[in-house]
């Protein structure tokens, strides 16, 4: 009884569906973009920077570079000039998609056993990272340059203006950054790195959200 019911129900569903109308006609799209722009970033300062760059006539690439420069300042736990990244550029007019690899590369002296300790065991994550052995050769600035030469519209210097202004005049620390500073302090990581502690404790006082 149940099997017959399921079979009839399936037939009913299939019969109730409208047939698809297939056509060989190709859809054409306008090659003029008139839909404005949208910016998404991890911090409002970076979003505002990207919007300002676009309003000045900059390209999406200009906006992305300027926004990332600001992110390196306002969220140093996640971004910065010491790392790497990718660029994926879509040209609306030509329909071309271009990928640029700007990730870090291993140092010339890197060896297969560089993360092995003298007793033959592998370093833990927290042993390897502060040792200096985990540092790759940064690729982000070269990525900026390559992308800007290919797709930039504004002068190179214009992309740094907001980051320089915020670094010179200050910015509101996000709760996330304040949390990471607290975490690093409780783990004793800032004590082991006087330079980092001085940066996050200007005038001897911890940065606050």
Q: Language-model segments: which ranges?
A:
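C-terminal motif of bacterial Sec signal peptides marking the signal peptidase cleavage site
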Residues: 15-16
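Sec-dependent signal peptide recognition
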Residues: 2-9
């Amino acid at each position: 009884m149940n099997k017959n019911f399921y079979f009839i129900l399936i037939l009913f569903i299939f019969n109730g569906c409208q047939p698809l109308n297939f056509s060989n006609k190709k859809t054409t799209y306008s090659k003029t973009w008139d839909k404005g722009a949208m910016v998404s970033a991890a911090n409002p300062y970076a979003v505002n920077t990207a919007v300002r760059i676009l309003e000045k006539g900059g390209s999406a690439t200009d906006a992305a570079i300027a926004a990332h420069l600001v992110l390196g300042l306002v969220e140093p736990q996640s971004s910065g000039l010491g790392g790497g990244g990718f660029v994926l550029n879509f040209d609306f007019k030509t329909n071309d998609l271009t990928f640029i690899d700007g990730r870090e590369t291993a140092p010339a002296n890197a060896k297969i056993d560089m993360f092995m300790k003298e007793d033959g065991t592998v370093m833990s994550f927290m042993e390897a990272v502060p040792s200096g052995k985990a540092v790759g050769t940064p690729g982000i600035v070269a990525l900026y340059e390559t992308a800007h030469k290919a797709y930039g519209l504004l002068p190179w210097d214009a992309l740094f203006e907001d980051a320089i202004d915020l670094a010179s005049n200050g910015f509101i620390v996000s709760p996330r950054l304040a949390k990471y500073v607290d975490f690093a302090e409780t783990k004793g990581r800032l004590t082991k790195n006087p330079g980092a502690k001085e940066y996050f404790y200007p005038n001897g006082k911890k940065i606050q959200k």
